[in-house]
Amino acid sequence: VLALGTASRTILTKEERCRVLEEMGGDVLLECPLTEKIRHMKAENFIKEILIGDLQVSYVAVGEDFRFGYERKGTPAMLKEFGKKYGFHTEVLPKEMDGRRKISSTFVREELNRGNMEKFRFLMGTDFSVEGIVEHGRGMGHKYLLPTTNLIPPVEKLMPPNGVYITVSHFRDRSYQGITNVGHKPTVGGEKFIGEEPVSYT
């Protein structure tokens, strides 16, 4: 059972993003905290102080619609211009398309909110997954010889709509096929679990 928080909204959690980048071959991940100074820093100053001054970059890769700096005035063209002056190369990556529509986080969220898991897999290049903390329940599953696992996902994780899904669960070095119910526990009167709407897989 997965207990869903109302603040769920990110496609990938911070930990998931880090793992994806590592699997893609990244050696080092540096995060820039969004302080008041950074929030109000002009794009030109961000390039000079952070990219050139602190990181001493030689190569920058951004998407074609990438924006940065105060009021989002920094553009890929600006990066290219400064790169010529300060000696770093900027590569601008085109958007991936699905027909005539650009693949974006908004597009992915729409399909996940619809429960279109096949489309989600196509857009993301991988199946939907969630990690969480196992929570002990009432033992109702064991009573009826159908044990379940109660799982609480990260509160910021965007989850699919209520429903029943075919799933694969991974624990330690083993995988288990199962059925996951996202929503209220159907066998216990539909009450909420630890104050949140649960999900269950058996």
Give the role of each language-model region:
Residues K14-R19, G53-V57, K85-G87, G115-E118, ...:
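Glycine-rich loops and low-complexity Gly/Arg-rich segments
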Residues V1-L55:
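Core alpha/beta nucleotide-donor-binding catalytic domains of modification enzymes
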